[in-house]
């Protein structure tokens, strides 16, 4: 069953108008879902319906439920209408997350990563980032004559980190083993101890094991991406050590929260979205989209099962 009316009823008319305008803009700019078949589109709609029901039945205030539901819909909306043209990506500033370290695809070849400099700030996902939030923009720069590209930081310091050819690895591994799809670890050329989670060996009903494995994997990946890259011949840092320390505190706080918290699901879906978008952006004309999509949906299934949502 496809959910036809799942939008949150916003408190003001102005917000509703803005949402409708954004939706119509993206829909008109993307007449066809070039990377998703009708079957996969229907499956994603069903996931949206089930998670919407799950969020709406949680024991939180209506404002918290609406905020979390809206954020998840923004993620799904981006997946639905993810066209690779720069004009569409320029308009798709809909992934404006509350969470620290969130990823936002605002324009072609650019990622915004927001984080708070106030390390003493209470760590939770229900409060908005305050005025002490700073933002850095990272650009993908393809290296001519090379199979790797860099993530360039648009800031006062000219720092960058080099990544491997992860997109092709993602696509090829997806066709062979859905649950062993190469993730962000393949991006870290300087990471000698790659962290791999054997999804096929994890019981889908073992919620604790799934949650712990995913948290440990993603946190270590982030530490490698944010840490000093001297081993790769680069003396500068993308993010200072105090920000890494702040990230550690937040990750510890996440681990101590209940696995039923929808915010954790949203955070993990951001990693999946980043992984998929990396493959599509780098190889938009040559990727085997069917295998990538199948792997992506199966990984979403695992994530949802950890929260008691069966797909």
From Swiss-Prot:
Which keywords does UniProt give here?
Answer: Cytoplasm, Nucleus, Sporulation
- Has UniProt tagged this entry with the keyword Nucleus? yes
How is this protein annotated for GO cellular component? cytoplasm; cytosol; nucleus
Annotated compartments: Cytoplasm; Nucleus
| Leader peptide range in chain numbering | none
**Could you provide one GO biological process annotation from this protein's UniProt record?**
sporulation resulting in formation of a cellular spore
Q: What does this protein do?
A: Has a role in sporulation.
The protein's name in its UniProt record: Meiotically up-regulated gene 146 protein
Q: Report the source organism.
A: Schizosaccharomyces pombe (strain 972 / ATCC 24843) (Fission yeast)
């Amino acid at each position: 069953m496809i959910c036809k009316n799942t939008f949150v009823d916003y408190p003001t008319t102005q917000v509703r108008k803005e949402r409708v305008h954004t939706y119509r803009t993206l829909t008109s700019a993307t007449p066809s879902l070039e990377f998703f078949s009708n079957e996969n589109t229907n499956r994603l709609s069903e996931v949206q319906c089930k998670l919407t029901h799950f969020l709406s039945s949680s024991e939180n205030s209506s404002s918290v439920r609406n905020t979390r539901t809206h954020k998840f819909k923004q993620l799904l909306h981006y997946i639905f209408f993810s066209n690779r043209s720069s004009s569409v990506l320029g308009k798709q500033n809909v992934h404006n997350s509350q969470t620290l370290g969130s990823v936002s695809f605002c324009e072609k070849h650019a990622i915004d990563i927001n984080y708070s400099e106030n390390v003493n700030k209470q760590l939770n996902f229900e409060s908005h980032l305050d005025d002490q939030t700073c933002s850095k923009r990272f650009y993908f720069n393809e290296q001519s004559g090379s199979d790797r590209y860099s993530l360039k930081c648009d800031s006062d310091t000219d720092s960058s980190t080099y990544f491997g050819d992860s997109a092709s690895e993602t696509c090829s591994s997806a066709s062979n083993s859905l649950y062993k799809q190469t993730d962000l670890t393949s991006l870290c050329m300087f990471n000698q101890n790659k962290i791999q989670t054997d999804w096929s060996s994890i019981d889908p009903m073992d919620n604790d094991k799934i949650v712990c494995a995913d948290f440990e994997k993603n946190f270590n990946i982030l530490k490698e991406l944010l840490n000093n890259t001297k081993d790769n011949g680069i003396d500068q840092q993308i993010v200072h050590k105090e920000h890494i320390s702040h990230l550690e505190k937040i990750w510890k706080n996440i681990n101590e929260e209940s696995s039923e918290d929808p915010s954790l699901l949203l955070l993990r879906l951001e990693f999946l979205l980043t992984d998929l978008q990396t493959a599509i952006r780098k190889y938009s004309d040559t990727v085997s989209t069917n295998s990538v999509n199948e792997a992506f949906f199966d990984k979403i299934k695992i994530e949802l099962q950890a929260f008691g949502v069966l797909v």
